Amino acid sequence: MVQLHVKRGDESQFLFNTTVDVQIETLTQQICEIYNARLKVDRICTEIPELADHGISLPPNMQGLTDDQIVELKLKDEWEERCIPSGGAEFKKDEIGRRNGHAPNEKMKDVLRRTMEEAKALISKKQLQANVCVTMEMVKEALDQLRGAVMIVYPMGLPPHDPIRMEIENQEDLTGTQASLQVITNEEAQLWWASKELHRGKKLQDYIGKNEKTKIIVKIQKRGQGAPAREPVVSEDEQKQMMLHYYKRQEELKKLEEADDDTHLQSEWSDRQALKRQFQGLTNIKWGPR
């Protein structure tokens, strides 16, 4: 199997196994699907702590308003009585005004948080360090875990406007958000290797040959952004090792310089001409009047 180290810019994303015979069209779709699904898991995991601490999301027309403004405008959250967490709610006001403040109890909070950590671990970049390749099945498992935890805590479900439910049902609207800049659709996705675009319509072996044991770095980006920056000749870890070696060498030279004692150069035994003068009888000669 060919192992691909997928990056976005200079940031590592995940490892992916494929074959040299794969069509670039298929490969792009597979990598793009995993890349975007991992982003979805991250977005849900970002909202889970808010759900655990402050309950369900308020309707859009009530978000950001003070209690007085809500009363004055005669607004009411119709989902508050429908979406009650298992075991009852504990009130904790959301200072931002996005959620209604009726949070789950500690036991249910623990279910949400524990599941969130398990889901994050499945698609974590630490998998790359452990040389574990990510598959779409792994990402789907993470999404299923999150969906299951939400159903346990909220048996009646979440409001249709809650960002977690919208993400789970693929109804999210990321327009105008920072998250939208990270998403890459299959139509606009490009794969690059060694500053070469991997063109759809060709196979991977057209670029890297037929060796199935190849390991390469592939970069994913949006069409029209030009060639991504080349990979540095020396990796970040190798650079750190070189700097450490250089520093240690400098310290060793400094210690040798400090320990360098040349007073012995005045000694008789260090005189290269002493033996010659001894054979010629020129030792112990005193100059000047006696």
From Swiss-Prot:
GO biological process, one term: pronephros morphogenesis
InterPro entries hit by this protein: CFAP298
Subcellular location: Cytoplasm; Cytoplasm, Cytoskeleton, Cilium basal body
Matching Pfam families: CFAP298
Domain of life: Eukaryota
Tissue: Strongly expressed in ciliated tissues of the embryonic trunk, including the pronephric ducts and spinal canal.
Coiled coil: none
Function: Plays a role in motile cilium function, possibly by acting on outer dynein arm assembly. Seems to be important for initiation rather than maintenance of cilium motility. Required for correct positioning of cilia at the apical cell surface, suggesting an additional role in the planar cell polarity (PCP) pathway. May suppress canonical Wnt signaling activity.
Subunit structure comment from the entry: Interacts with dnaaf1/swt. Interacts with lrrc6/sea. Interacts with dvl (via DEP and PDZ domains).
Family: Belongs to the CFAP298 family.
Protein name per Swiss-Prot or TrEMBL: Cilia- and flagella-associated protein 298
